[in-house]
Amino acid sequence: MTPPGRLYLLRVCSTPPLLLLGLLLALPLEAQGLRGIGLTPSAAQPAHQQLPTPFTRGTLKPAAHLVGDPSTQDSLRWRANTDRAFLRHGFSLSNNSLLVPTSGLYFVYSQVVFSGRGCFPRATPTPLYLAHEVQLFSPQYPFHVPLLSAQKSVCPGPQGPWVRSVYQGAVFLLTRGDQLSTHTDGISHLLLSPSSVFFGAFAL
């Protein structure tokens, strides 16, 4: 009679290798002597869940809303301390430009409204061109880059009082330290009121 120990060895040796491999894979890692090699819960998460995001749920996101200064003369000036205008969570206003506090996606918007009493001279009116542009100045560029731009024209032709509005808005990937500013043609025709002329941005 074969001793039990020898019989056990014979049975193992006669087992097909593929069956042994399947049994081994079915065992828990601890039973295989591989304690500590298993994936941690964080490592087992999908890769897209581990990407860093600049803003997490509950984080107060940067936002700014500016309105046109009624004392504007040669160029459109912005202010943030009145008429529901504000600077929040990192945004600041310097040299009439918004300073981006954190890198990320931002919705940038602006509106202006132009108005006039009519076309001059009335006999042979000349075209009047109106334009408004939001510009980006960044350490990556040596000059102002247009982000949003729109143009309108009024006249020629006999007409009475007129009003033209321009609204623009889009999403941009901005970098901390970027500066957002505006350029406007037709300053003398701006209808300066908080609900008509404004400029802002907020993080997404």
From Swiss-Prot:
Disulfide bridge positions per record: 119-155
GO CC terms in record: extracellular space; membrane
A molecular function GO annotation: tumor necrosis factor receptor binding
Swiss-Prot/TrEMBL GO biological process terms: cell surface receptor signaling pathway; defense response to Gram-positive bacterium; humoral immune response; immune response; lymph node development; positive regulation of canonical NF-kappaB signal transduction; positive regulation of chronic inflammatory response to antigenic stimulus; positive regulation of extrinsic apoptotic signaling pathway
Endpoints of the signal sequence: 1-33
Lineage: superkingdom: Eukaryota
Residues of this chain annotated as glycosylated in UniProt: 95
One Pfam family per UniProt: TNF
Keywords assigned by UniProt, alphabetized: Cytokine, Disulfide bond, Glycoprotein, Membrane, Secreted, Signal
Location(s) in or outside the cell: Secreted; Membrane
Task of the protein: Cytokine that in its homotrimeric form binds to TNFRSF1A/TNFR1, TNFRSF1B/TNFBR and TNFRSF14/HVEM. In its heterotrimeric form with LTB binds to TNFRSF3/LTBR. Lymphotoxin is produced by lymphocytes and is cytotoxic for a wide range of tumor cells in vitro and in vivo.
Similarity annotation: Belongs to the tumor necrosis factor family.
Listed name of the protein: Lymphotoxin-alpha
Organism: Bos taurus (Bovine)
Gene coding for it: LTA
